[in-house]
Amino acid sequence: MAMSDPIADMLTRIRNAQLAEKASVSMPSSKVKVAIAAVLKDEGYVEDFAVRQADGKANLEIALKYYAGRPVIERIERISKPGLRIYKGCDDIPRVMNGLGVAIVSTPKGVMTDRKARASKVGGEVLCIVA
């Protein structure tokens, strides 16, 4: 059976791996997942990521980050879901924890953080929040 929400699956895998104190987590790859991983790396929430080919299928491997033995990501949640998409204009994109966290937004200019979307004056689909 096909997966109904691959992005939620990705976020859940990251959350579960960090709770289990794993060094890395692997999942099926897609362009959107790679873009989300790139934003997480740029914002300092993960160490690194790489796309690896295994048996003709691309897998995304994310190296998780810890500080003083605790996961750097305290909270990671899906906002826009397949059954209820959430689109926001550039002025309405939510600030996560008053700017301490980030909202990851899919815009016509690509996947980016809420701050970059506001600076670029572009809105889009609010994929998830990370704090």
Curated annotation (Swiss-Prot):
GO terms for molecular function: rRNA binding; structural constituent of ribosome. The keyword RNA-binding applies. Keywords: Ribonucleoprotein, Ribosomal protein, RNA-binding, rRNA-binding. One of its GO terms (biological process) is translation. One of its GO terms (cellular component) is ribosome. Gene3D superfamilies: 3.30.1370.30, 3.30.1490.10. Disulfide bonds: none annotated. SUPFAM superfamilies: Ribosomal protein S8. Belongs to the universal ribosomal protein uS8 family. One of the primary rRNA binding proteins, it binds directly to 16S rRNA central domain where it helps coordinate assembly of the platform of the 30S subunit. PANTHER family: 40S RIBOSOMAL PROTEIN S15A (PTHR11758). NCBIfam families: PRK00136.1. Part of the 30S ribosomal subunit. Contacts proteins S5 and S12. This is Small ribosomal subunit protein uS8. The gene is rpsH.
